[in-house]
Structure formats: structure tokens, C-alpha cells
């Protein structure tokens, strides 16, 4: 599931954790929150790679 995630800096990892925690605080399951943030990271990385 996470094999295609790009390497993240500590700051990027921290930001991802904070976003996941925010989604969970809004009532989302942990798995769903992780899935959403992972997809967001993949999309951002793909967009940067295309430039």
C-alpha cells in the first residue's frame, strides 16, 4: 500500500501526521484518514514529477 509513496522529509511527515489527526478528530477512521493523506501525497509528488 505504501510502496509507491515518495520519501518524505521529517517536516513533511509531521505535516501528514497532523492532517491525519485532524481528519480523525472530525470523526474519520484512522484507515480512511491515512488513505486520503497518502493519496494526496502521491498526487502532489506526481504533479511535481511532471513539471
Swiss-Prot record:
<protein>
    <recommendedName>
        <fullName>UPF0181 protein VVA0806</fullName>
    </recommendedName>
</protein>
<dbReference type="Pfam" id="PF03701">
    <property type="entry name" value="UPF0181"/>
</dbReference>
<dbReference type="InterPro" id="IPR005371">
    <property type="entry name" value="UPF0181"/>
</dbReference>
<comment type="similarity">
    <text>Belongs to the UPF0181 family.</text>
</comment>
Amino acid at each position: 500500500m505504501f510502496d509507491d509513496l515518495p520519501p518524505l522529509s521529517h517536516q513533511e511527515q509531521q505535516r501528514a501526521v497532523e492532517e491525519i489527526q485532524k481528519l480523525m478528530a472530525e470523526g474519520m477512521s484512522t484507515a480512511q484518514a491515512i488513505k486520503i493523506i497518502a493519496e494526496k501525497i502521491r498526487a502532489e509528488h506526481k504533479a511535481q514529477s511532471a513539471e
